[in-house]
Curated annotation (Swiss-Prot):
Name of the molecule in the record: 3-ketoacyl-CoA thiolase
Record Gene3D superfamilies: 3.40.47.10
Pfam families associated with the record: Thiolase_C, Thiolase_N
NCBIfam families: AcCoA-C-Actrans (TIGR01930), fadA (TIGR02445), PRK08947.1 (NF006510)
Assigned EC number: 2.3.1.16
Main EC class the enzyme belongs to: transferase
PROSITE patterns listed in its UniProt record: THIOLASE_1, THIOLASE_2, THIOLASE_3
Family as reported in the entry's similarity comment: Belongs to the thiolase-like superfamily. Thiolase family.
Keywords: Acyltransferase, Cytoplasm, Fatty acid metabolism, Lipid degradation, Lipid metabolism, Transferase
A GO BP entry: phenylacetate catabolic process
Organism the protein comes from: Alcanivorax borkumensis (strain ATCC 700651 / DSM 11573 / NCIMB 13689 / SK2)
Function of the molecule: Catalyzes the final step of fatty acid oxidation in which acetyl-CoA is released and the CoA ester of a fatty acid two carbons shorter is formed.
Length: 391
């Protein structure tokens, strides 16, 4: 297909394997190092990339303190060996942070404010807990439900509103692990995972090449044994149907089509449209629905035009209502999360947006699809969506 000079193209996308946050393979590896090694991998994989042209490094990260503080994007940029003349910024749209990084870079390219960007995100939830240092304002209870900051309870609420059963959630959780492990065994992650040095259970250095969060033997019987964790008396959401805490990073090289052509780089996809949207904080998991509807309208598409979808699996009780209202529930096995999702891989908050977009691109190449949708929910009631098209 023909490209316009200012079309935003994705040249490459990579990620780390996902590590368990509790005594996992990256327990002795810092967030900056996970990220810097991805940028170095992008350099190695794309030797025609003139790094001197890099305008900005935009990195998503949610809890920006401790090793993730002091503008981690700039620290990553310098550790990776990018020129000092390239700028760097860290962005925070909670779970959608690294997808927002992609949007911010795309908007800059579209408006002529730079040609070459490195975007990505990271969260080391083993080193910096999700709630570390958080001081919530009690006055928030005047404007939204008191449980709006408790993600598991928002999933319970959304699931109840849409009649999602415990059995449906358990089946969805097993599906995620099954598909993710199949993808591992069949090498479908190989083009996106960059092996990273970590440590085994005995503390010995090892090269980490697979997602350690996946449970290959996950079964319905095992899921049924788990108790609800957020609403023990009446709930349906368990640890097995929630995204795991994990450590990981993701990265993309994006630029204008004219710059990619000038450098002799072959784009893999272009950005068709982008959108963010708000929803009630008490059902924050619903955000992908209005965000996707906006993105589809901006691209002049309908959901039937989308070949493949990556929907971040914060919770099964959240993902299923979104799939239902996007008219995807009957097409799950054909086009949604064909390599599993965050229930199996975990959800390192700042990492996930670029991760699912990169995974979407690889699924589209594997299945020879043309148009794909990546979308995710965001805490306190937001959604974000990106539509890409292969070129």
């Amino acid at each position: 297909m023909s490209l316009n000079p200012k079309d935003v193209v994705i040249v490459d996308a990579v990620r780390t394997p996902m590590g368990k946050s509790r005594n996992g393979q990256f327990r002795h590896v810092r967030a900056e190092k996970l990220s810097a090694q991805l940028i170095q991998a992008l350099m190695a994989r794309n030797p025609n990339w003139d790094i001197q042209l890099t305008e900005d490094v935009i990195w998503g990260c949610v809890n920006q303190t401790k090793e993730q503080g002091m503008n981690i994007a700039r620290n990553i940029s310098m550790l990776a060996g990018l020129p000092r003349t390239s700028a760097a910024q860290t962005v925070n749209r909670l779970c959608g942070s690294s997808m927002q990084a992609l949007h911010s870079a795309s908007q800059s390219i579209m408006t002529g404010n730079g040609d070459v960007f490195v975007i990505g995100g990271v969260e080391h939830m083993g080193h910096v807990a999700m709630d570390h240092g958080i001081d919530l304002n009690p006055e928030m209870s005047k404007v939204t439900a008191k449980a709006s900051n408790m993600m598991g309870l928002t999933a319970e609420m959304l699931g109840k509103m849409h009649g999602i059963t415990r059995e449906q959630q358990d089946a969805f959780g097993v599906r995620s692990h099954k598909l993710a492990w199949e993808a591992t065994q069949q090498g479908r992650w190989d083009n996106e995972i960059v092996p990273i040095e970590g440590h085994d259970q005995n503390g010995h250095k090892v090269l980490c090449e697979i997602d350690e969060v996946i449970r290959p033997g996950a079964s319905i019987e095992d899921m049924q044994k788990l108790r609800p964790v957020f609403d023990p008396a009446n709930g349906t959401v368990t640890a097995g149907t929630s995204s795991a805490l994990s450590d990981g990073a993701s990265a993309m090289l994006v630029m204008s089509a004219e710059r990619a052509q000038a450098l002799g780089l072959k784009p893999r996809a272009k950005i068709r449209s982008m959108a963010v949207a708000g929803c009630d904080a008490a059902i924050m998991g619903y955000g992908p629905v209005p965000a996707t509807q906006k993105a589809l309208a901006r691209a002049g598409l309908t959901i039937d035009d989308i070949d493949y979808v990556e929907l971040n699996e914060a919770f099964a009780a959240q993902s299923l209502p979104v799939a239902k209202d996007l008219k995807l529930l009957d097409k799950m096995e054909e086009k949604v999360n064909l390599n599993g999702g965050a229930i199996a891989l975990g959800h390192p908050l700042g990492c996930s947006g670029a991760r699912i977009t990169g995974t979407l691109l690889n699924v589209m190449e594997w299945k020879d699809g043309q148009i794909g949708l990546a979308t995710m929910c965001i805490g306190l009631g937001q959604g974000i969506a990106t539509i890409i098209e292969r070129v």
